[in-house]
Amino acid sequence: MNRSRAIVQRGRVLPPPAPLDTTNLAGRRTLQGRAKMASVPVYCLCRLPYDVTRFMIECDMCQDWFHGSCVGVEEEKAADIDLYHCPNCEVLHGPSIMKKRRGSSKGHDTHKGKPVKTGSPTFVRELRSRTFDSSDEVILKPTGNQLTVEFLEENSFSVPILVLKKDGLGMTLPSPSFTVRDVEHYVGSDKEIDVIDVTRQADCKMKLGDFVKYYYSGKREKVLNVISLEFSDTRLSNLVETPKIVRKLSWVENLWPEECVFERPNVQKYCLMSVRDSYTDFHIDFGGTSVWYHVLKGEKIFYLIRPTNANLTLFECWSSSSNQNEMFFGDQVDKCYKCSVKQGQTLFIPTGWIHAVLTPVDCLAFGGNFLHSLNIEMQLKAYEIEKRLSTADLFRFPNFETICWYVGKHILDIFRGLRENRRHPASYLVHGGKALNLAFRAWTRKEALPDHEDEIPETVRTVQLIKDLAREIRLVEDIFQQNVGKTSNIFGLQRIFPAGSIPLTRPAHSTSVSMSRLSLPSKNGSKKKGLKPKELFKKAERKGKESSALGPAGQLSYNLMDTYSHQALKTGSFQKAKFNITGACLNDSDDDSPDLDLDGNESPLALLMSNGSTKRVKSLSKSRRTKIAKKVDKARLMAEQVMEDEFDLDSDDELQIDERLGKEKATLIIRPKFPRKLPRAKPCSDPNRVREPGEVEFDIEEDYTTDEDMVEGVEGKLGNGSGAGGILDLLKASRQVGGPDYAALTEAPASPSTQEAIQGMLCMANLQSSSSSPATSSLQAWWTGGQDRSSGSSSSGLGTVSNSPASQRTPGKRPIKRPAYWRTESEEEEENASLDEQDSLGACFKDAEYIYPSLESDDDDPALKSRPKKKKNSDDAPWSPKARVTPTLPKQDRPVREGTRVASIETGLAAAAAKLAQQELQKAQKKKYIKKKPLLKEVEQPRPQDSNLSLTVPAPTVAATPQLVTSSSPLPPPEPKQEALSGSLADHEYTARPNAFGMAQANRSTTPMAPGVFLTQRRPSVGSQSNQAGQGKRPKKGLATAKQRLGRILKIHRNGKLLL
């Protein structure tokens, strides 16, 4: 409710009066007055119209309204009047009747069955006598010089901060001899101020001069408290300067534009004048603002409650209850901390903390409120609570939504600037940006826009701002996910051991290591459980390389993961090391960590605690260390699975059996795929660079690593010098692929996937000029067949457990080496063929999985035709526009999906096949060469195992293949018999037909048929020409090959369409 409009009648607050009917007034009014009031309603003895800023009281006799200043009634005393009589009615009915008290306030409050009212003398006495949890458990006590933006960023400004001396805070204050009369002098005695009646917990208006008289009066009938005297626009503002940290963080100080049409919020400077026993009930500062208090004289006691979700819900229910002044909110929560702020001390209360204030002695203090970016989400949450509680505008942050729009625009600029400069925003800024964007969406919804559009600045384009901010947040979060596990706590600002030389003041019972600059001890340090070994190892792993040396007295920090895992895996034994263990880990170590058996023969290690005492930790025995090493290795491997939920797995190929556990149970490790060329975080290379608020001290670098390199940091040390797939290797590969001029480029090379795409586009653009040299063509043929070697070897190696260095290098990627007497003939042939292929590669680069041939490779190398035919299963071979159509070998075990056959295509193929069979029979009878007829008959007869198939497509010229090969190359060694024509119709439906003139095609991968691309290719064949010369008869044009004849029979148009 607006206090300036409050009107009191018999102690009750009433709305402004309605215009009076002047015809019913008493005869004390003159005719002149009646005529004047007929047009404009007037009141009181002064006959003035209604003034919203002046206090008025109603007469119970004549029902007229009078100004308190005109009839001599003060607003704070009006509540004690039972029946008020105006000066005119006083003559007829006597003086006003005051309320009758049934006894003293003490007896009234302590009456049986009557609850104690908040703010009453009894309430204050009971509050003084109660005990609360000490605030030393939660508050921080840095010096003024330590309280910087970096300090708050590291600790997120989530707990109160008490600075014992104002030195280093950078604020200006009057001398301790400054009094309330001096405040009146600088502000003015006529300044109207809001005053709280503590006993009634009600607000009233007073002039500052009247309050000063009350303050210095010998007898105070009431307890009045002034907590909302904002003096930014007075002369007192020149004597008070807010702390430097507040000026750096405040939104109003830094982001409110000078030319804004909205009124600038003035909430930075307040003067608090409180008499003894003043009490302010529990509240959250308006708009979720943080607040600073400096006690110039006297003392104040703060009762602090942490803003957890449960406590905020209880607070909202308590604030909306009808008997709020009969319940002490501190009794409803689990923890309520008591913090006493004495003269000369400064307290900073963070966003959302619920607090009440008691003044034990007369006190003069200064303070102020400010919004900041360290906890935007909590500020918005507090603002929503205010709206749900229907808090009056007078007690809310002025133009809160307006400043939020300006801040959203500012955060967007920060994100863009940092991204362009390859620098990272801090995590609190990202969370704040997300919370702001959600609030913007809620405020601009169609149904809610009328209530919020008045506070939207004209210079802000709301829709575009929401869209751009969401995009930047999405980009930043992608970078965050890519850097999880790669760097040690880059984006989270909570550090285990913040760097600093000056220790903070903390309770004596805290047992944190003296190196730590910040600790949040529990209420009872002896009851705090120590960390278990696994938790300690996880913390040490997250800490990474941030830990530094503790001191010269033999206190060294050490990376526990390096000590346990690396030494155990390399040598099997442990070196002596000193560990950085917090005091919490040492408390009750015998009870909470029974697994850590100590050997009394080992040399102890002394640790100096923050309280000056020493503790000795005995080294672990050799057998115990071996067990712990296994546990640590397991924990480290399981920690890699944290990334599982952050990324989408493309295929089952990412599932590998980790072989490092030996005889232990094999753990299924998920290797997440990371996109290439994403920004990575690296330590800032410029030590002189000034870090901006909201930025992390790390740069962004372009990453050119492959998927294997993303996990190389975890398993790289386990192998013996395995460097396959590293950055240097990939850069070399890029140079091999790019050609001789590629090294002259100034830009960084593209990733292998990009190079493969470039190769495909170049091949499509240079179809006629790609068959240049035999050497390059052999490389291309090897590339086509090499894919299936790697896939076959990976499938053969999957599921094997080996402790050899080779298997540790790339688990699941190498084939199993068998003794000579175990190998079959086909395996020996494959091994010999692979050796020949590797020899033919020459200087072409290759790594553990891939080969990177040059762009001039071709498939027409005659050297490849001399190699033995063997079955290839490279389904993932890259498409090449130069590749010939290769026969698809039957896959007996391949499941056929139901509903995938096209009836029209099947019917057409069946009819065409039948017609083809008849034509071939007729041609065979008319041919002069009798030698070919037995072969044709053999082909025409269906094989026994294919009798159950619906259709068999014969190709009569395939039988001539052995003879054609003999003319160009020697006979290959014998191998298992392959049948190019067997298989169901599903094997030939969507794939190319077998070719009788390409013997080397058996070494290639299966290529899917693409109408218009493969079937229309016409290439002259050396084998076909020799065959024609030997026969002495030249076939018709366009019918030289079986593919051409089949295309003619099936009526396949040259554009690749199948005409049925």
Curated annotation (Swiss-Prot):
Where is this chain compositionally biased, Polar residues type?
508-517, 1018-1030
Gene Ontology CC: nuclear membrane; nucleolus; nucleoplasm; nucleus
Relate the outcome reported for changing residue 943 to H. Reduces transcriptional activation activity
Compartment(s): Nucleus; Nucleus, Nucleolus
Question: Which residue ranges does the record assign to the JmjC domain?
Answer: 231-387
Q: Write down which residues bear the modification named Phosphotyrosine.
A: 704
**Which top-rank group of organisms is this from?**
Eukaryota
Per the entry, the cofactor note is:
Binds 1 Fe(2+) ion per subunit.
Please tell me where substrate binds in this chain.
280, 300
**Bias (Basic residues):** 924-934
Cofactor(s) required, per the database record = Fe(2+)
Start-end of Acidic residues biased regions? 826-839
Its recorded reaction(s) are:
N(6),N(6)-dimethyl-L-lysyl(36)-[histone H3] + 2 2-oxoglutarate + 2 O2 = L-lysyl(36)-[histone H3] + 2 formaldehyde + 2 succinate + 2 CO2; N(6),N(6)-dimethyl-L-lysyl(9)-[histone H3] + 2 2-oxoglutarate + 2 O2 = L-lysyl(9)-[histone H3] + 2 formaldehyde + 2 succinate + 2 CO2
Which key words are in the record?
Answer: Activator, Cell cycle, Chromatin regulator, Dioxygenase, Disease variant, Intellectual disability, Iron, Metal-binding, Nucleus, Oxidoreductase, Phosphoprotein, Transcription, Transcription regulation, Zinc, Zinc-finger
Q: Where is this region: Linker?
A: 101-115
A single GO BP term for this record reads: positive regulation of transcription by RNA polymerase I
Zn-finger (PHD-type) residues = 41-92
The family annotation for this protein states: Belongs to the JHDM1 histone demethylase family. JHDM1D subfamily.
- Which protein are we looking at? Histone lysine demethylase PHF8
Gene name in the database record: PHF8
